[in-house]
Every structure is written in structure tokens, then in C-alpha cells.
């Protein structure tokens, strides 16, 4: 299907393979599960004649290399490329521009299928040169983006997103524009820009058709996770907690509904239990895993800040009880977050009391005004010295 558009629930096979390769290298996946994963990876590699990947996996000790199988794969690839080149030559000699483009596209898709990254990108450029319609050019960008996500090539992804946006200045339909939002949202999430990812995902909830990247329930999982650390309570309620599209699916993802609703409803014991259940899913996600520790800190910052907003002072024991943890745990946690400037409070160790000292909006505005005034005064003084000279 052109542009790699996914049928409902149909993820792009190479992205399924990429996730399995990620799990194979993950220390938290047990050896028995890795036996099945290895078999799945080998079957996928053989099915698509991914000779270069097979060779590199063999060199890395992930798979055992069979020289005869590798030679068979390479032989089939050479034969198929010969046929594709013949079709291109025939189209150029006997057929129209549309058929020539289709023949070049077929060669591009074949290089993608067998996992020849550089050849695929080169052939996609050739195909683009034969392409006039903006929509078809966009489809080529989506193919490039999928290659980028398979290899986690963020430079390629970033450049392709910029290219797509420039193409949309020439035209383009809303369906493709909406799909691009999900691609960009995934890129933002994978590069730790959770706030922008949440915004793009929320914009795409009612128009989601990007099944080639991931199923809809995974999309909702990402949307909730990014929104929780990016939105204020009012926005979270309107856009996430009460969103019908999220309500329809959230129950399919273990712990996600309790995670979201217990946070919003200030049920902190339930929140910690649900959060603990979600950590495994976050750790085993190839896009989120590199940011696991960062995300854990951000979520705890949100929930501790929310709890403390209700008090001018509160005992450590009361807070520990609310979260279902020990006083020592809360003491250690808050000490770290206060030292890092994440929480606006101080600990009275003698009385075992937390005292909040967050600046209110008026105070924050006052401090900002003073800062800007000092900056302006310094500029004026520098200017006056220059004039005096």
C-alpha cells in the first residue's frame, strides 16, 4: 500500500521486527522469552530476505549465521533487482511517466523490504524525481520516516518531518497532514520532548489512521503518559480524563485507567500501585525505555506537587500515609526533589513537617518584573557609557 498506510490494527512488519530486536537485547526479558523472540526474528528475516540484517545479527551473536542461507538470500535479491531493473527499462522505453514512476517505486519498496537502508533511501530519491503529485511525494516521505524509526535514525526522521511540512505548503490533504502529526509526536516522545508529543497526539485522537506505526491502544498509552506530565489539571480533565476516544480504549491497557484517574482524583495509594504496574511497560517500550528514569522523576514531581499544593504545612507521616509508603522513603524522595529545584518546600527535620514555600502567581510576576528591570537598567548603563565615549 502506497505511503505505508496501515490497515486498522496492521502494524508495519519491520517495526514489529524492530521491537522484537529491541526486546532480544533487553536485560529484563527472560531467556525463555528470548528463545521465542529469536525464532520470530529469524522467521521475519528469512521471509523478507533481509540478508544484510541477518549477517549483522550473526556478527553480533544474536542469531547463528548459516552461510548457505545467506548465499540463497543474496542470490534471490540479485535476481529480483535484475527483474525490477528490466521493468524500469521497459517502462522507460515503451510506457508513460506514471508507469516509469511505479517501476521505480517498486524497486524502492523492495530495497526497504530486504533492509537495504542506503539503497532504499537512494532509490526513494530517484522515485521522487519521477513524482509530480504532492500526495505521492508525501507517501515517499512516510516510507522514509518508517525507515528512520526502524533504525532509530533521528537525524533522518527530523529532516523528513521538515521536508513533509514544506511539501504541505504546496498543498496536501488533511488525512496525510493528520498522519504526519502522529509521526512527529512519536519523534518528539522518542527525543524527550513530551510536551510537544502530548499536544500532537491529542490533536490526532479523533483522526488517527496511523496503524502502520502502532495499534490505537498503544497510541492512547503514549497520549496518556505524555499528557500526565505536560498538562495542568484543567486541561488534563478536559482533554484526557473525559475524552470519549480515550475512555473507549483506556481499559485495554493494564493499569492505565487507574494511573490517570487516581492521579486526577488525588487517590495517591492507588496511583502508586498503578504507576508501579506501568513501569514494566515503559521499560519494555523501545521509544520510552531510554527516558525511563527521566519519566519516573517527572511523574513523581507532578504527583508530589499536586499533593503539596493543598497544604501550607503537612506532617511527613500524613504524606507517607497518603502514598502508602514509609516516612523514610518520603524523606529521601523529597530531599532529592527539593535539592534539584523540582519542589517548592522545605523539610523541618525536628518537627517532621513539610512547609511549602512555592511562589504564588503575583510573587512570580513581581520577581520577573524586577529581573527584567535589572536587565533593562544594565543595558541603559552600557549604552550611556558608549555614548560618553
Curated annotation (Swiss-Prot):
SMART domains: PINT (SM00088)
Biological process terms in GO annotation: proteasome-mediated ubiquitin-dependent protein catabolic process
Gene3D superfamilies membership: 1.25.40.570
Domain of life: Eukaryota
Occurrences of domain PCI (ranges): 193-361
Keywords from the UniProt entry: Proteasome
Any one of the GO CC terms: proteasome complex
Function: Acts as a regulatory subunit of the 26S proteasome which is involved in the ATP-dependent degradation of ubiquitinated proteins.
Family: Belongs to the proteasome subunit S10 family.
Name the record gives this protein: 26S proteasome non-ATPase regulatory subunit 6
Species, as recorded: Oryza sativa subsp. japonica
Recorded name of the encoding gene: RPN7
